[in-house]
Amino acid sequence: MAKHSSFLFFLCILLSTILSGCAIKKNNHSPTFIVHKSAEQRVAQLAQINQWHLRGKIAFIEQRKDKKSKRESATIAWQINEKNQTQELNLTSYLGINVLNLMSENNQHLIKVQGKEYRGNNLAQLVYSITGLTLPTNALSFWLKGLPYQSTDQVKLSSKTHLPINLTSQFDNNQWQIDYSKYKVFDDIQMATQFTIKKDDLLIKIVIKKWFLTH
């Protein structure tokens, strides 16, 4: 009888230990809650970032006069060093073919397309003359971070998260509308991962898979 009681006692201790271990393991996977910073705090954080790199997808959808839309899609890899005033941008087709390679330093731009090289100091104009694509890179480097490009730009913030949900901006004598959605935390900063950018009959859609931010 004593042996039977000892066995039951040992079994209870063993089960208690296993259950405690499961409870501890479960707690280790408890969800983390995001603390939303004020708009000023987020802008201050972004001001400390002097290098950034993103990877994702981009699509250009243009409504033509014949009412047929023209669509161009590519994967995008873009890195900027604001301190050194350099950047590199690559657009690649879904088949892995490099569509466009851009390298810039001190506002001097080199674009390589299909083995040919093109140079200039007006980047948006240079891209358009080569590819027919409207890519407002100067302003886009601000817009993607949810920052105004011009002092007259208007940023609309979410009342709950204090994050940009809409931005109205002026670039190249045109008004652009930028909408933000699906924020994720990268290097302790909430960054949008989906964008729609509109101007007249042009719609640019961007989905970012990964942000890399460096102080």
Could you tell me what each predicted segment is?
Residues 86-134:
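An acidic-aromatic
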Residues 76-80, 101-104, 180-185, 210:
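Extended lipid/amphipathic-ligand handling interfaces
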Residues 58, 91-95, 104-106, 115, ...:
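A mature extracytoplasmic/lumenal domain signature
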Residues 22-77, 81:
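N-terminal leader/targeting segments and the immediate start of mature chains
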Residues 55, 71, 84-85, 99-103, ...:
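Beta-strand-dominated lipid-handling architectures at cellular/organellar boundaries
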Residues 125-160:
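Solvent-exposed helix/loop surface patches that form functional interfaces
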Residues 146-215:
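Gly/Pro-enriched, hydrophobic low-complexity segments
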Residues 1-24:
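Sec-dependent bacterial lipoprotein signal peptides
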